[in-house]
Amino acid sequence: MNFFLHKNTTILVLAPIIVVASITFGFWFKFEKNITGFFLIGETFKKSPFLDENKILIVKNEVGYDGQQFLSLAFDPLMNHEGTLESLDNPRYRAKRILLPLVSNFLSLGEYKLIPYVFVILNSIGILTIFFMFYIIQKNKQSYYLLTLAIPGIWIVLRISTAEIIANTLILTSYFFIQQKKVKASFLFLMLACLTKETMIIFTISYGLVFLIKKDFKKIFVLAFFFIPFYIWHIYLIYKFGLGRDFD
């Protein structure tokens, strides 16, 4: 079992190999070199107007999963195309998780064919980041780091292309920086996590409560300041969709 301990640097090489091998197997063999297989596109929901239905992998007898929704959003993050709105089961709710689709679109430089690839690559990088962050944070303890990759959830998320990997990566990074007393960096990654998945706001509340108990009002102010992009995005959603519940 010593092979799995942090002292064996071989695991730092094995982790990327495992992730790359998993993606390669899925792309080449399971999905027959069709990257859209990672998004679990079903038969029921309307497809993004930026997708050619003759060139995507549609899973029969499937409604369609979150990955399909994220991909539609990645093609048109501001949801300016009417077809994008029609392809989303609940645009207001889906758009609250904008960061991963937005970054995928940005890094693809407007090339729609590249967006699915970038999306999958970002989630893959997220898995490795979680592994290496855990290694850095726990490096002075005897931990079985390679077993981090044995968590089923990360591979499920990679398979269906949702935002949990990136959200948790950002939260872990925020935690790392707060431990290093780098408060501003921590708050930045915390804000990005909340733009990735809105339920991460629970960590923001936790931070705020700790600062409130300690009467550290300066940090509360700084935390609120770093969330300006978060406020702006939600103001945009109100402008576009009005006020109301997510599930109208």
Identify the residue ranges that each predicted region occupies.
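Extracytosolic helix-loop segments that constitute the early lumenal/periplasmic catalytic or substrate-binding loops
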Residues: 44-89
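Start-transfer (signal-anchor) and selected internal transmembrane alpha helices
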Residues: 1-51
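Membrane-lumen/periplasm interface segments of specific transmembrane helices
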Residues: 22-34, 205-209, 213-248
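Transmembrane-helix signature of polytopic, membrane-embedded enzymes
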Residues: 112-117, 131-153, 169
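Membrane-interface alpha helices of multi-pass inner-membrane proteins
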Residues: 172-177, 184-211, 226
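Specific aromatic-rich, kink-prone transmembrane helix
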Residues: 133, 157, 166-185
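Loop-to-helix entry region of an early transmembrane alpha helix in multi-pass inner-membrane enzymes
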Residues: 86-94, 98, 102, 109-129
